[in-house]
Amino acid sequence: DFNALAYNGADEKTKKLFVNFTKRMREEEGVKFVTVLHDYPAADHEGVISVGTAAELVYWTAGASAGAEVNESLTNTAYDGEYEVDAKLKKSDYIKGIRKGQLLFYEEDGTLRVLRDINSFTSFAAAKNSDFSSNRVVRVLDSIANDVANIFSKYYLGKQSNNANGRNLLKAEILAYHEELMKLEAIEGFTADDITVEKGTEKQDVVVYEAIQPVDAMEKLYMKVEVA
């Protein structure tokens, strides 16, 4: 198992191959990981992080992403690698970069930090909104997909009858797992009504439906000041 894949080269064809591989593995094989590339916002996918600063920061970003906890954001995380990178940009450049889906670094008091922990997804729509551009949100969703699959494989696959009692046991275990995620503040507002475990088309099939509210980190502060 692995959590992140990285390539810091400049070859556009190779980048596209990485993106296509990532999409196929995530969407068709159910293997949840992220790929980190340098300056490739064209990926436009929640599973691909495009580092818009220096290429030298790609592998650090991949390592930090792979090691991040389910309730952790890399926003404002200090870079502790060995490279010296010039990350001084105009405010307008940072704004443009974020809109393009670039993960950028900024410098504060001599320390390099992650501006916002985002991925390259920018094609927001009603069915898939801007929440999916947050790496913390994607981290939560990927963790749930991986962990529920592991629970099923370890305790239920070929071991439990696919009847009402067996499905209720699976539901109870998944619910307990989500309660732990709420304690970690990875998700919020989850109740037993937000999950259903049903029999699928075939006798051996089980289908799980969930409604999830991932928690994200504070990133923007808006203030209203009243002058009396």
Question: Where do the protein language model's features map onto the residues?
Answer:
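Structured, hydrophobic secondary-structure cores that serve as assembly/anchoring elements
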Residues: 65-228
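Extracellular Cys-Trp
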Residues: 1-76
